[in-house]
């Protein structure tokens, strides 16, 4: 995985261009042989509209939500896409301007209104976006597109039509939830979001949405708070993008990237700011690990500490001999990585992209080990006794346990990100293989496989080809953990070929099985699922 491609032609810029939705599915041109058992839909979310009228969106996470679908059946493939009819999208299309403030783009009052109307608009308070561009996941028999606010949007996975908007605040005490829930085999959904805890201080709630019952009753009505994690700072919650789960525990990593609540509450009504303006870094905090028992939900008051890093994606967590093993895609330091994901940065020429990446936090895949049985008299001793890892946990005199990781992969400005595993069989369990999107100075230019035990790596890459997060689909008669395929949408702009394709790789060694090319460019996608 140390090989590095150069991109002087700047073809990666194409994934940040707006596109039009499709009136109906279009056929793909298949080369290779798609496995007969691979019959289903690849659903992907991402930004598809990067400007409205004359007004641009500024950040990667601002573009309007576009739902993509590749249908696979009997060796044939079709591609379809539609914009989700969120309030943010519909109002923007109606008024031909940015109407609701997005992650890094501020919406301003209509310039056509008189001064008194504009003044009143500023003081109406916060209008939270429902632009659900990040992920899509099932709740019961339904599918919901999501971002990280309190709004999720039900969509039809067959027609891609927008069904309805759901406000999670009507059911749960959370200000928002992550776009990375954990879903168990019975359909139980777990997620995490910040909330107001005791004495009006901030906290983080693990929420549980039960599986669909025989009577088909509303699952949201039966959702509940399972356990609460305290916040290290009363009015500054950490940014949370994902969390970990094992058979018996939840793992929450609290990073030094903070949301300044005072800025957040005054941004829209007074200062005219956006979400990115409300982030700041606590350069003295480091990073804290929290644990909670799963059933019954109970916070475990062990004080795990380590040096500062950003974390967006957990790879996997599992329990072993009284320890919890936590594998993460980290970015070193306390500076917020999202500062480097403004579209102006991502669209720069190749040499400028490389210069920016030199200044950014550096990526590293790390393994941390958290002991469950801790005794104060063991000060100064490494509490980790697992024979297969060099990760350590040392009790300090102040009662904290200092963690040092084992590095599973590290390459200068080469990230292993958007990780996937054989989720249905190995989530929360001891595992061997992870799959990821390789970022070269933030440019996605390879698909990676990592053996977390041996640290062996495999890659797929082609010149001027820009893949997406690879999703693992297990073979129906699988005996081995990596017996299956990887699905990734690849953009390959140029005059000599069709500009995008669905790539199907053999998960064991990342050799190509087939590709399904389409005659339209496909903008960047973030996350998604495979629906059999």
From Swiss-Prot:
Transmembrane segments: none annotated. One of its GO terms (molecular function) is all-trans-retinyl-palmitate hydrolase, 11-cis retinol forming activity. Its EC number is 3.1.1.64, 3.1.1.90, 5.3.3.22. Its main location: cytoplasm. Disulfide bonds: none annotated. GO terms for biological process: retinal metabolic process; retinoid metabolic process; zeaxanthin biosynthetic process. A lipid is attached at residues 112, 329 (S-palmitoyl cysteine). Keywords: Cell membrane, Cytoplasm, Hydrolase, Iron, Isomerase, Lipoprotein, Membrane, Metal-binding, Palmitate. It is a lipid-anchor. Its cofactor is Fe(2+). Retinal Mueller cells. Detected in the inner retina near the ganglion cell layer, in a region where the Mueller end feet are located, and a weak signal is observed between the outer nuclear and ganglion cell layers (at protein level). Signal peptide: none annotated. GO terms for cellular component: cytosol; endoplasmic reticulum membrane; membrane; plasma membrane. Catalyzes both 11-cis retinol and 13-cis retinol, 2 stereoisomeric forms of retinoic acid from all-trans-retinyl ester. Acts as an alternative isomerohydrolase in retinal Mueller cells by catalyzing formation of 11-cis retinol, to meet the high demand for the chromophore by cones. Capable of catalyzing the isomerization of lutein to meso-zeaxanthin an eye-specific carotenoid. Belongs to the carotenoid oxygenase family. This is Retinal Mueller cells isomerohydrolase. It comes from Danio rerio (Zebrafish). The lineage of its organism: Eukaryota, Metazoa, Chordata, Craniata, Vertebrata.
């Amino acid at each position: 995985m140390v090989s590095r491609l150069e991109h002087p032609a700047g073809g990666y810029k194409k994934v940040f261009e707006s596109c039009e939705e499709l009136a109906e599915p279009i056929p793909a041109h298949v080369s290779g042989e798609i496995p007969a058992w691979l019959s289903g839909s690849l659903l992907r979310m991402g930004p598809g509209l990067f400007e409205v009228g004359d007004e641009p969106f500024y950040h990667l996470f601002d573009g309007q939500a576009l739902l993509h679908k590749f249908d696979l059946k009997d060796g044939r493939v079709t591609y379809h896409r539609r914009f989700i009819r969120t309030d943010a999208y519909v109002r923007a299309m109606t008024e031909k301007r940015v109407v609701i403030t997005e992650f890094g783009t501020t919406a301003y009052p209509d310039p056509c209104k008189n001064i008194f109307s504009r003044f009143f608009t500023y003081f109406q308070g916060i209008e939270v976006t429902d632009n659900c561009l990040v992920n899509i996941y099932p709740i019961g028999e339904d599918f919901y597109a999501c971002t990280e606010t309190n709004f999720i949007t039900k969509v039809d996975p067959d027609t891609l039509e927008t069904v309805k908007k759901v406000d999670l605040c009507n059911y749960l005490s959370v200000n928002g939830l992550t776009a990375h829930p954990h879903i168990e085999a019975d359909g139980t959904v777990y997620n995490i979001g910040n909330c107001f805890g005791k004495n009006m201080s901030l906290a983080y709630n693990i929420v549980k949405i039960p599986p669909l019952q025989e009577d088909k009753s509303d699952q949201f009505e039966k959702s509940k708070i399972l356990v609460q994690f305290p916040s290290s700072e009363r009015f500054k919650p950490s940014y949370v993008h994902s969390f970990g789960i094992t058979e018996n525990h939840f793992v929450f990593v609290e990073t030094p990237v903070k949301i300044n609540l005072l800025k957040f509450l005054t941004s829209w009504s007074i200062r005219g700011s956006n979400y990115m303006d409300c982030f700041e870094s606590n350069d003295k905090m480091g990073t804290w690990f929290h644990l909670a028992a799963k059933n019954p939900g109970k916070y475990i008051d062990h004080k795990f500490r380590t040096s500062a890093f950003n974390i967006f994606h957990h790879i996997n967590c599992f329990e072993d001999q009284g320890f919890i093993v936590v594998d993460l895609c980290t970015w070193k330091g306390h500076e917020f990585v999202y500062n480097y994901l403004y579209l102006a940065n991502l669209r720069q020429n190749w040499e400028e992209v490389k210069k920016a990446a030199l200044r950014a936090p550096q990526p590293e895949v790390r393994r941390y080990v958290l002991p469950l049985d801790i005794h104060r008299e063991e000060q100064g001793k490494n509490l980790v006794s697992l024979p297969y890892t060099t990760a350590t946990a040392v009790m300090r005199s102040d009662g904290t346990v200092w963690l040092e990781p084992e590095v599973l992969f590290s390459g200068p400005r080469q990230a292993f990100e958007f990780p996937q595993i054989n989720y249905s069989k190995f989530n929360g369990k001891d595992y061997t293989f992870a799959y990821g999107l390789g970022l070269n100075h933030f440019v996605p230019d390879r698909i990676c496989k990592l053996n977390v035990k041996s640290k062996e790596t495999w890659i797929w890459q082609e010149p001027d080809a820009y893949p997406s997060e690879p999703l693992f689909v297990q073979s129906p008669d699988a005996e081995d953990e990596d017996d299956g395929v990887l699905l990734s949408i690849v953009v390959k702009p140029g005059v000599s070929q069709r500009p995008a394709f669905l790539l199907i790789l053999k998960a064991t060694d990342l050799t190509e099985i087939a590709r399904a090319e389409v005659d339209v460019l496909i903008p960047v996608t973030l996350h998604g699922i495979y629906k059999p």
